[in-house]
Amino acid sequence: MLVFSFLFVVVSINLNALIFLCKKSWASYLFLYLYNFFFCEDEYKLTKNCVRVEAIAPFMMCLGSLGAILGKQRTANFLLLSYNVINNPVVLVYYVENFSRINFIKHTTKEKSVIWTNERQLNPWICN
C-alpha cells in the first residue's frame, strides 16, 4: 500500500510520470482507482472516473489531449481532455480505453453541480 501511495503522489505532481502511466492501461485504471479512493467523496464514487476539481489549481492552462502528446489521439488509454478557466474551476475529463463511452466528471461550483454525459455537451470546453 505504501508503494501505491508513493506512486499516487508522484503521478499527482509529475506530468511526465502521468504520461508514462498513460501508456499502460493497467496503470490508468490503478491511477483512477487511487484518485477515487483518496480524493473522491461518497457522491463522486458513483462514477468510475472522478476527481475533486477543488484540488486542481484554477490557473492551469489548457493541457490539451494527452493522447495527442503520445501521438494516439483516439486510442490512448488515458486522456486529459479539457479545462475551464472562464468560470475558474478547472474541469478534468478522463477517457479510459474500453469504456463504452466517455464518462464526464461531476464537478461542483458554488452555484450548482453539473454532470456532462456526452461529448456534444462538452464541446465548448475541449482543448484541441
UniProtKB/Swiss-Prot annotation:
Which chain regions cross the lipid bilayer?
Answer: 1-21, 51-71, 76-96
Q: Which domain of life is it from?
A: Eukaryota
Positions the record marks as coiled coil are none
Question: Can you supply one Gene Ontology CC term for this chain's record?
Answer: membrane
Where is this chain primarily localised? membrane
Compartments (UniProt record): Membrane
Q: How does it sit in the membrane?
A: Multi-pass membrane protein
Q: Does the keyword Transmembrane apply?
A: yes
What UniProt keywords are attached to this protein's entry?
Membrane, Transmembrane, Transmembrane helix
| Additional remark text | Partially overlaps YML089C.
Tell me the protein's name: Putative uncharacterized protein YML090W
Q: Can you name the source organism? A: Saccharomyces cerevisiae (strain ATCC 204508 / S288c)
